[in-house]
Swiss-Prot record:
Protein name: Phospho-N-acetylmuramoyl-pentapeptide-transferase
GO cellular component: plasma membrane
InterPro entries: Glycosyl_transferase_4 (IPR000715), PNAcMuramoyl-5peptid_Trfase (IPR003524), PNAcMuramoyl-5peptid_Trfase_CS (IPR018480)
Cofactor(s) listed in the protein's UniProt record: Mg(2+)
Disulphide-bridged cysteine pairs: none
Coiled-coil residue spans: none
EC numbers for this chain: 2.7.8.13
Gene name, Swiss-Prot/TrEMBL: mraY
Membrane association type: Multi-pass membrane protein
Keyword Transferase: yes
Lineage of source species: Bacteria, Pseudomonadati, Pseudomonadota, Gammaproteobacteria, Alteromonadales
Role description: Catalyzes the initial step of the lipid cycle reactions in the biosynthesis of the cell wall peptidoglycan: transfers peptidoglycan precursor phospho-MurNAc-pentapeptide from UDP-MurNAc-pentapeptide onto the lipid carrier undecaprenyl phosphate, yielding undecaprenyl-pyrophosphoryl-MurNAc-pentapeptide, known as lipid I.
Length: 360
């Protein structure tokens, strides 16, 4: 929004032209989201406590989690609020990339909000019925996938980028819709499964978003894109604003979510952030890279699939409890140790993912 004001003011002083630079607006977007989160955080936490909107803890979970019962949840509202304000202020509202991301965050945030509402207000630990949650997620993801496919303006927007192979970028055609759908829904649920310990989900989310900010910037410049053999996507630089807003909002939330957590993000945060990462990966044509950089999310999801599959087929469990972070808790690892080690894994995987841009 301020881009248009700055464009007008540039007529009177050329100094305002600095607002036309994506990098400058990205930094301001990060700082805006961070400061808003830090400012609104205590107020939101106090409000959630007064409304008795506290975490519902399963009785069959680790005993160490029983002390978390009643901790304010739905803190994802803080994250979403910070992202929306930052993007609306510093993003180019004429960009379809911006509006796609706001739709993703808003729609999946609403699904998560309904789920959290049923859990904390109606005291239903299962929340929104799984079938309805999946239907709503699918509807939102398909709307996004169809929109992106039908409005694609250049071949690069529907290519599949394969890491390590510079000349392997097949055109997907209508398969793009299927891939986009599974990427967005899968990423949304993967982050949701990871959000089980204090700060466990938000830090990898911040790291992946920061990496995608760089990739979006490179994709928006023809010279960088050609040099790295990635699709040149004009206008994708506006995704940098969204990514840095996620980074700022995430760091602000981590201030209150770090162990021992004062607030949890709830499904309103995890479902929307996961979907956002998936949508960004689709927009910059890096779905496979998301699997690498978001390896912690993949690991958590695969552990659940293996656990359920093994129990149904063989009647035996592979892990003491799934997702896998609970397995390590039950092995005796203190919660902070599990969290920090998963963060370290995430740092390694994000750096590995970025390295693939050059290793082709």
């Amino acid at each position: 929004m301020l881009v248009y004001l700055a464009e007008y003011l540039t007529r009177f002083h050329t100094g305002f032209n600095v607002f036309s630079y994506v990098t400058f607006r990205a930094i301001l977007g990060l700082l805006t989201a961070l400061m808003f989160s830090l400012w609104w955080g205590p107020k939101l936490i106090e409000r959630l406590q007064l409304m008795q909107i506290g975490q519902v803890v399963r009785n069959d979970g680790p005993e160490s989690h029983f002390s978390k019962r009643g901790t304010p949840t739905m803190g994802g509202l803080m994250i979403l609020g910070a992202i929306f304000i930052s993007v609306l202020l510093w993003g180019d509202l004429g960009s379809r990339y911006v509006w796609v991301m706001l739709f993703v965050l808003g729609s999946f945030g609403m699904i998560g909000f309904i789920d959290d509402y049923r859990k904390v207000v109606r005291k239903d630990t299962k929340g929104l019925i799984a079938r309805w949650k999946y239907i709503l997620q699918s509807l939102a993801a398909l709307i996004i996938a169809f929109f992106l496919y039908t409005t694609a303006s250049n071949p690069g927007e529907t290519q599949l980028v394969v890491p390590f192979f510079k000349d392997v970028m097949p055109q997907l055609g209508a398969v793009f819709i299927v891939l986009a759908y599974f990427t967005i829904v899968g990423s949304s649920n993967a982050v949701n499964l990871t959000d089980g310990l204090d700060g466990l989900a938000i830090m990898p989310t911040v790291m992946v978003a920061a990496a995608f900010a760089l990739i979006a910037y490179l994709s928006g410049h023809a010279q960088f894109a050609n040099y790295l053999h990635i699709p040149h996507l004009p206008g994708s630089g506006e995704l940098v604003i969204v990514c840095t807003a996620i980074v700022g909002a995430g760091l602000g939330f981590l201030w209150f979510n770090t162990y021992p957590a004062q607030v949890f993000m709830g499904d309103v945060g995890s479902l929307s952030l996961g979907a956002a990462l998936g949508a960004i990966a689709v927009l910059v044509r890096q779905e496979i890279l998301l699997v690498i950089m978001g390896g912690v999310f993949v690991m958590e999801t695969v552990s659940v699939i293996l656990q359920v599959g093994s129990y149904k087929l063989r009647g035996q469990r592979i892990f003491r409890m799934a997702p896998i972070h609970h397995h390590y808790e039950l092995k005796g690892w203190p919660e902070p140790r599990v969290i920090v080690r998963f963060w370290i894994i995430s740092i390694f995987l994000v750096l590995l993912g970025l390295a693939t841009l050059k290793l082709r």
